């Protein structure tokens, strides 16, 4: 669950490359459907209006502004882009929230998730015929029945451990559920490694919390079983394999967590 800003600044070219490949995989079949006998290039198909909508889902302890660099590049290339807020209220709730948002979009969608956002897109896109591709950016891609707690425990080195968390109750929370913050002392190294110290400390103060149910809710039938998937992985973070998650990746063959 590393910070989106650090991950994206370091790997923006890789993210854009993965999105280009994923969108090309959507564009080409669409152009072939529209003009079955024509030999169109990806660029020609895109120019003709076949570009999919790209939806970006941020991860834990972050907000939609963490996608700003990616959004700027995609908009410059003529894509329609949405970065809806992730409520961070638990995997079940957050997935339903995103699924409803996706239903408001007409036409094909390339759905992108970072870190915890990968688990959300894994659940939200299941059964949605408009989602044509998934892109995982240093992200979780749990199998059915898995929890993020299980995945985090499977590989040592995660920062999301009790010693680094401040869990605060909130009104109406189910028993045992609270809002988790990364402690301000741990945040710079855990979530903002590579950022200037001043910016890291500001992010520590302004971080949105995530409900602890995000890591305890079991994942449902994964969308990556039926939707083509690509992964952009971080080299410095622990990765957690989701067994049968099939996909494409510049750094690995599967979506990671």
Language-model regions, residue ranges each:
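N-terminal export and membrane-targeting signals
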Residues: 2-20
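C-terminal region of N-terminal signal peptides and the immediate post-cleavage residues
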Residues: 26-48
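Active-site catalytic motif of lipid deacylating hydrolases and related acyltransferases
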Residues: 43-107
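Gly/Ala-rich beta-loop-alpha elbow adjacent to hydrolase catalytic centers
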Residues: 112-117, 121
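Flexible "cap/lid" loop of the alpha/beta hydrolase fold
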Residues: 130-131, 135-174, 211-214
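Conserved strand-to-loop "acid loop" that flanks and positions the catalytic carboxylate
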Residues: 134, 230-237
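Active-site nucleophile elbow and catalytic-triad environment of alpha/beta-hydrolase enzymes
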Residues: 202-223
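Conserved loop-alpha-helix segment in the C-terminal half of the alpha/beta-hydrolase fold
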Residues: 234-257
């Amino acid at each position: 669950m590393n910070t989106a800003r650090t991950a994206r600044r370091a790997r923006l070219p890789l993210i854009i490359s993965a999105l280009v490949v994923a969108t090309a995989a959507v564009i080409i079949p669409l152009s072939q459907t529209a003009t079955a006998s024509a030999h169109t290039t990806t660029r020609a198909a895109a120019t003709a209006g076949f570009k999919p909508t790209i939806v970006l889902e941020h991860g834990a302890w972050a907000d939609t502004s963490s996608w700003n660099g990616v959004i700027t590049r995609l908009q410059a290339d003529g894509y329609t882009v949405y970065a809806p807020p992730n409520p961070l209220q638990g995997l079940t709730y957050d997935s339903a929230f995103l699924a409803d948002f996706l239903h408001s979009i007409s036409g094909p969608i390339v759905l992108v998730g970072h870190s915890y956002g990968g688990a959300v897109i894994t659940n939200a896109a299941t059964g949605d015929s408009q989602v044509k591709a998934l892109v995982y950016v240093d992200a979780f891609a749990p199998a059915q029945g898995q929890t993020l707690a299980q995945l985090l425990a499977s590989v040592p080195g995660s920062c999301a451990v009790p010693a680094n968390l401040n869990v605060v109750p909130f009104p109406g929370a189910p028993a045992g559920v609270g809002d988790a913050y990364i402690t301000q002392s741990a945040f710079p190294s855990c979530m903002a490694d590579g950022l200037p110290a001043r910016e890291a400390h500001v992010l520590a103060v302004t971080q949105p919390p995530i409900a602890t149910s995000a890591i305890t809710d079991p994942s449902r039938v994964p969308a990556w079983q039926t939707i083509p998937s690509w992964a952009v992985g971080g080299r410095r973070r622990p990765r957690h394999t989701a067994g049968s998650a099939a996909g494409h990746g510049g750094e690995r063959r599967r979506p990671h967590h």
